[in-house]
Amino acid sequence: MTTAPSYFVWYRLAGDACEARSAVTAMMLDVAVDCGVVGRLMKRTDDPSTWMEVYETVDDPVAFERTLAEALERHGALAYADGGRHVERFVACGALDVE
């Protein structure tokens, strides 16, 4: 079973959604280029002002977290998170997960 964590970063949208999407997309692109972790941006079906970034199977959490923090700062994406960004880390534990 893999021990590489997946990151789930959720927050409530603050400000203009188009501007936020541009900043977050640029941030995620930097993360993908700089450390090879491709993220996905999602929103809740019942509350489109709640967004989540998903980064799966992060092999080097220290480098990933540093790169994410730098990209977050560079693109000013934190300004679009009302109440801050909530970061959660999960690892696979299911019977069908690859060992």
Where would I find each of the regions flagged by the language model?
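Short S/T/G/P-rich N-terminal loop/turn motif that feeds into the first structured element of a domain
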Residues: 1-50, 55-69, 86-99
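Acidic/histidine-enriched active-site and ligand-binding environments that engage anionic O-linkages
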Residues: 78-88
